[in-house]
């Protein structure tokens, strides 16, 4: 089961090929953005999850998962989620974009440094959320917000190139793209 995004099936098929499995024997089911209940209810045998939320949820419920990483030797790494802007906005309102990204970076840096406090802020604005899940998720996510980047939001051209080339090979892109036109670090805080 997956969220139904066009990129998911080629990634899952690629993982299966690398493992020597036959993807044609799998029924792909779109369960929307709440895949975990489909697994628990037995409507799916395999689900695409966000480890920092669904994986934590499984752990809290005592459900053991066998995780297969989406990227590595078979599927190139890629950036997700992304903040996207139009070129015209960047040209005409670049200062606004810089301030927005600086504020966003401060928020992520605060969340990484203060996981308990940031979880409480989220719960204040999303009281329907499960406090145990929010706190455990934030504790797991905190050290990963920046990952191996020198600063929050920083992206590498080679990651874009490798994944774009893979997408082209999978016929998800009609033509190759120039990574320099796909992203920029120019608006990030220094």
Question: Model-found features: residue ranges?
Answer:
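Bilobed "Venus flytrap"/periplasmic-binding protein-like clamshell domains
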Residues: 1-61, 76-80, 158-162
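Residue-level "edge-of-site" marker
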Residues: 29, 52, 71, 180-181
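Helix N-cap/coil-helix junction residues
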Residues: 21-23, 63, 128-129, 172-173
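Residue-level signal for threonine
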Residues: 86, 156, 184-185
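A generic structural-conservation signal
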Residues: 25, 48, 67, 132-133, ...
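Pocket-lining segment of extracytoplasmic ligand-binding domains
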Residues: 34-128
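Secondary-structure end/capping motifs
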Residues: 92-172
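Conserved C-terminal helix/tail region of periplasmic/extracytoplasmic solute-binding proteins
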Residues: 160-190
């Amino acid at each position: 089961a997956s969220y139904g995004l066009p990129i998911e099936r080629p990634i899952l098929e690629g993982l299966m090929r690398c493992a020597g499995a036959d993807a044609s024997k799998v029924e792909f089911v779109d369960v929307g953005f709440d895949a975990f209940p489909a697994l628990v209810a037995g409507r799916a045998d395999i689900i695409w999850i966000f480890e920092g939320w669904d994986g934590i949820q499984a752990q809290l419920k005592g459900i053991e998962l066998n995780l297969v990483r989406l990227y590595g030797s078979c599927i190139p790494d890629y950036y997700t989620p992304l903040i996207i802007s139009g070129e015209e906005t960047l040209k005409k309102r670049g200062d606004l974009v810089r301030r927005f990204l600086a504020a966003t970076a401060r928020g992520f840096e605060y969340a990484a440094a203060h996981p308990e406090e940031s979880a409480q802020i989220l719960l204040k604005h999303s009281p329907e959320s499960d406090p145990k899940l929010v706190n455990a998720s934030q504790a797991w996510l905190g050290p990963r917000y920046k990952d191996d980047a020198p600063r929050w939001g920083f992206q590498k051209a080679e990651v874009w190139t490798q994944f774009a080339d893979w997408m082209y090979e999978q016929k998800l892109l009609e033509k190759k793209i120039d990574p320099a036109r796909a992203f920029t670090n120019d608006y990030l805080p220094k």
